[in-house]
Amino acid sequence: MAYQEPNKDGFYGKFGGRFVPETLMTAVLELEKAYRESQADPSFQEELNQLLRQYVGRETPLYYAKNLTQHIGGAKIYLKREDLNHTGAHKINNALGQVWLAKRMGKKKIIAETGAGQHGVATATAAALFNMECTIYMGEEDVKRQALNVFRMELLGAKVEAVTDGSRVLKDAVNAALRSWVANIDDTHYILGSALGPHPFPEIVRDFQSVIGREAKQQYRDMTGQDLPDALVACVGGGSNAIGLFHPFVEDESVAMYGTEAAGLGVDTEHHAATLTKGRPGVLHGSLMDVLQDAHGQILEAFSISAGLDYPGIGPEHSHYHDIKRASYVPVTDEEALEGFQLLSRVEGIIPALESSHAIAFAVKLAKELGPEKSMIVCLSGRGDKDVVQVKDRLEADAAKKGEAHA
């Protein structure tokens, strides 16, 4: 299968596009032009590759999780260790690429949105490296949940704006960042943190994150002597770590691809972020994608224990993969993610981010199903330092409830 998405209008099948007001159209067209020029310039990629090596610490290891594999007794599990990047997650791959692009465009200021704070920290880091002014928009709810990352961003010289609109989470931060971009287009570049938004953002983010899958593909061959793994697993909020792992394998049809969505308290409750399980097509933040919405087309609130997954939409390329049945998207509850978080910590000595824990939880199930002859690559998108206090509080609260129930 030859895969050449997006088309010239930024559509992945029927998803994607550019649904933006006239005031933003100039900016996205300027961005696309600058991006095409950078793609054609070998020095751009050479400089970026050097930064990825020397500053970020790439390539990240592909680690055979022997203890986890033996513990489950199923398929071999290989972890793509994006948690070992500088700043602790995959987000730096995109932030660095986009800040370098903005610098080439002659922009002076960087703005970004963040949920868990990882993209905010990565953007503030890249802005500090390139000596650019930086403002990060973050939902007030997430500011509370991720106080440590807020301090990190400020330490790196960024200004953090707490967004008090709506439910004060990621989608509200995106809205605030887009408004700010409209007002300051001439000297400002907006760095979207996931593979969504108006074209060319999903393509740019995918291309910068595809380093994950390209490395993993070669590393798997070098480690095993086999051509391809049987499956890929990655968590999906907006979907940038997943698209980064999946895209280099999209034409390899023998490789099954699984995105794990946040099922929160369960997909049959109102508290989840399982967009492809429960959503339907709609326009959000400049792109046609699957969206959680009510019967009147109003965007529903997304919910997840993990701040990085509670987005009510999903990148248009994931909607397309789902539509053409190239990838499967499976819901994973808070409870299951917490089990994955503890299991990986206990058996491998690796504390995963809550986002990545959704992928670990499903990988455990899938490994049992596939059996010991098969193998999979799981994207460990980030480290769990930022989540340890939240998990501690949650587990203590759960233990207290159980204690009361037995009393």
UniProtKB/Swiss-Prot annotation:
It comes from the Bacteria. Its cofactor is pyridoxal 5'-phosphate. GO terms for cellular component: cytoplasm. CDD domains: Trp-synth_B. Keywords: Amino-acid biosynthesis, Aromatic amino acid biosynthesis, Lyase, Pyridoxal phosphate, Tryptophan biosynthesis. It is an enzyme of class 4 (lyase). Its EC number is 4.2.1.20. GO terms for molecular function: tryptophan synthase activity. Pathway: Amino-acid biosynthesis; L-tryptophan biosynthesis; L-tryptophan from chorismate: step 5/5. InterPro entries: Trp_synth_b_CS, Trp_synth_beta, Trp_synth_beta/beta-like, TrpB-like_PALP, TrpB-like_PALP_sf. Tetramer of two alpha and two beta chains. Belongs to the TrpB family. The beta subunit is responsible for the synthesis of L-tryptophan from indole and L-serine. This is Tryptophan synthase beta chain. It comes from Streptococcus pneumoniae (strain P1031). The lineage of its organism: Bacteria, Bacillati, Bacillota, Bacilli, Lactobacillales. The gene is trpB.
